[in-house]
């Protein structure tokens, strides 16, 4: 009996030692990677300290704000909002069929699933800014390049969110429709979409909000929107106009965030209330 207890204790000690070694090795690897990253990024806080007076001089030059070009700035803000809206709509139209093929419970076969997932990963794996550079070279300067950049990036983001909303759906109603002889299109239309629609709308609203924030800087590379105005003020050292542009961007993004957040809350809360008010089975 004592020998058995000693064996168990020895085994526990060995496991504890092995665990400590793994933790130590993991810590060494993580700290080494952080040290390499620190070196590569050339972190030098003394440069920040030396640059603070220059930064403060920029801040002083921002005031008072120059409102002489407010109409141009507001036009750029409207263009930015339009780019984000149209780009999100295009992305949603493309993403929905891809999401159906990228969800395990609705994809026709494993190859379709893998290809669709690869497309979505590639789409969202490339930043909107990179797409903007490509489309500016392809179709020229202007908001159309920004719309295309937002569309191509957001297809991957929306498609992934849609697929994740579709996969957990209860298969019971879908199987019941299939037993009645309903076509695949009707099963999706009457069995799947009503169940996931609130989550799909909430996802689109979130992406729209994100697209507005993203599109504010696309003008820096010539893809339209208020970013071009911001770049012009920086290039011309018009800091008092720059603060006006930044204020408009902040107000626009804050308003869109608030509207999107409220709409998502109302949509998802309505769905929860709908389930809560269902009559109980007797």
Swiss-Prot record:
Pfam family, one: BPD_transp_1
Ranges annotated as spanning the membrane: 23-43, 81-101, 130-150, 239-259
NCBIfam families on file: PhnE
Native source organism of the sequence: Stutzerimonas stutzeri (Pseudomonas stutzeri)
Domain (ABC transmembrane type-1): residue spans on this chain: 77-260
Record-given protein name: Putative phosphite transport system permease protein HtxC
Topology term for the membrane: Multi-pass membrane protein
Keywords: Cell inner membrane, Cell membrane, Membrane, Transmembrane, Transmembrane helix, Transport
A GO MF term: ABC-type phosphonate transporter activity
Family per record: Belongs to the binding-protein-dependent transport system permease family.
Known role: Probably forms part of a binding-protein-dependent hypophosphite transporter.
Chief localization: membrane
Record InterPro entries: MetI-like, MetI-like_sf, PhnE/PtxC
Gene3D superfamilies, alphabetized: MetI-like
GO cellular component terms, A-Z: plasma membrane
Compartments where located: Cell inner membrane
């Amino acid at each position: 009996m004592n020998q058995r207890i000693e064996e168990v204790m020895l085994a526990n000690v060995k496991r504890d030692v092995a665990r400590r070694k793994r933790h130590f090795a993991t810590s060494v690897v993580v700290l080494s990677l952080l040290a390499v990253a620190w070196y590569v990024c050339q972190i030098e806080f003394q440069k920040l300290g030396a640059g603070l007076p220059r930064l403060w001089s920029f801040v002083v030059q921002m005031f008072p704000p120059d409102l002489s070009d407010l109409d141009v700035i507001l036009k750029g803000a409207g263009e930015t909002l339009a780019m984000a809206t149209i780009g999100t709509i295009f992305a949603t139209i493309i993403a929905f069929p891809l999401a159906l093929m990228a969800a395990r419970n609705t994809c026709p076969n494993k190859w379709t699933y893998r290809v669709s997932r690869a497309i979505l990963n590639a789409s969202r794996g490339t930043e909107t800014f990179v797409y903007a550079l490509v489309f500016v070279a392809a179709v020229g300067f202007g908001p159309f390049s920004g719309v295309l950049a937002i569309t191509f990036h957001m297809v991957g983001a929306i498609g992934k969110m849609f697929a994740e909303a579709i996969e957990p759906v209860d298969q019971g109603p879908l199987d019941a429709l299939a037993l009645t002889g309903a076509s695949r299109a009707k099963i999706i239309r009457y069995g799947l979409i009503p169940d996931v629609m609130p989550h799909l709308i909430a996802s689109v609203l979130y992406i729209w909000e994100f697209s507005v924030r993203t599109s504010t800087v696309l003008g820096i590379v010539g893809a339209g929107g208020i970013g071009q105005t911001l770049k012009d003020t920086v290039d011309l050292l018009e800091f008092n106009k720059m603060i006006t542009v930044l204020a408009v961007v902040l107000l626009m993004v804050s308003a869109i965030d608030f509207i999107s957040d409220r709409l998502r809350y109302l949509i998802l809360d309505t769905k929860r209330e709908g389930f809560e008010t269902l009559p109980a089975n007797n």
